[in-house]
């Protein structure tokens, strides 16, 4: 009985080991992002609205896929956040500006390190160099949030590796706002007409949905099959051991009956001798 339980437990652990690597496939650097990014809203509220933060902005963030600008953008965010950190004193309060910025710098530095590890696999360089600009806290951390969100889907977006070239007919870039929504990414604007641009955007959206569905299927199917195989092995082993258990119980009952008969015969002989 103990051997059967041990085998079932082994099957369960085997399923967990097979399933665990599959649940971490989305986002090559998403595990570097901690919950400290949620303090961005508090930081924006603490800073003056007219305070200007210098950032070398990568052109094309609003019209190019994230793999075209994320590598350079995260490096520039690291520089700007470090400069911003130097302007605040080291206050021990948990939610002070210094502590929040310090945590954000650590997150961005980890992302820079991760991007260096995957620089040749999933990212490209923009065709234009970053441009120094001045941003209010709301706009600056809107760019920060968009960059952080881009890491969560970087593996999906980078799978097609489209060219990182900004069309000459691209519209002016819109201001980024602090938001927790997914990054809003458009394909390169076509030079022909607005109608062609709309159709290409629709195709991009449908392809993204199909990619997400395919990835979930790739995760769910192996997990399902490993679960079925694990239970099949467990059932087979239990069925194989069941006859042995039945024979063991029968032999035990026979031995008990033989012992009882022997005891009765022994008592009968003792009675006859008396």
Curated annotation (Swiss-Prot):
This is Kit ligand. The chain crosses the membrane at residues 216-238. GO terms for molecular function: cytokine activity; growth factor activity; stem cell factor receptor binding. Residues 239-274 are cytoplasmic. Residues 1-25 form the signal peptide. A soluble form is produced by proteolytic processing of isoform 1 in the extracellular domain. Changing residue 218 to D: In allele roan. Pfam families: SCF (PF02404). Keywords: Cell adhesion, Cell membrane, Cell projection, Cytoplasm, Cytoskeleton, Disulfide bond, Glycoprotein, Growth factor, Membrane, Pyrrolidone carboxylic acid, Secreted, Signal, Transmembrane, Transmembrane helix. PANTHER family: KIT LIGAND. Disulfide bonds join 29-114, 68-164. Stimulates the proliferation of mast cells. Able to augment the proliferation of both myeloid and lymphoid hematopoietic progenitors in bone marrow culture. Also mediates cell-cell adhesion. Acts synergistically with other cytokines, probably interleukins. Homodimer, non-covalently linked. It comes from Bos taurus (Bovine). Residues 26-215 are extracellular. Glycans are attached at residues 90, 145, 196. GO terms for biological process: cell adhesion; positive regulation of biosynthetic process; positive regulation of cell population proliferation.
């Amino acid at each position: 009985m103990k051997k059967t339980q041990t085998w079932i437990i082994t099957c369960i652990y085997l399923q967990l080991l097979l399933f665990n690597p599959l649940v971490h496939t989305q986002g090559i650097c998403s595990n570097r992002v901690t919950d400290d990014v949620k303090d961005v809203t508090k930081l924006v509220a603490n800073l003056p609205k007219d305070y200007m933060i210098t950032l070398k902005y990568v052109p094309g963030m609003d019209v190019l896929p994230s793999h075209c600008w994320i590598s350079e953008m995260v490096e520039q965010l690291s520089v700007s956040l470090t400069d911003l950190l130097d302007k605040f004193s080291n206050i021990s309060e948990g939610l002070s500006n210094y502590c929040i910025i310090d945590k954000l710098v650590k997150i961005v530095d980890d992302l820079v390190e991760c991007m260096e590890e995957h620089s040749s696999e999933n990212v490209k360089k923009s065709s234009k160099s970053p441009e120094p600009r001045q941003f209010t806290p709301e706009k600056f951390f809107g760019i920060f949030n968009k960059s952080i969100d881009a890491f969560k889907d970087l593996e999906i977006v980078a799978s097609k590796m489209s060219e990182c070239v900004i069309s000459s007919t691209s519209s002016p870039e819109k201001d980024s706002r602090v938001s927790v929504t997914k990054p809003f990414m458009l394909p390169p604007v076509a030079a022909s007409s607005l109608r062609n641009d709309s159709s290409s955007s629709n195709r991009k959206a449908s392809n993204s949905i199909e990619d997400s569905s395919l990835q979930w299927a790739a995760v769910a199917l192996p997990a399902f099959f490993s679960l079925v195989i694990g239970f099949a092995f467990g059932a087979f082993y239990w069925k194989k051991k069941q006859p042995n258990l039945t024979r063991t119980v029968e032999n035990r009952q026979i031995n008990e009956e033989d012992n009882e008969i022997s005891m009765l015969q022994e008592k009968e002989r003792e009675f006859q001798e008396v």
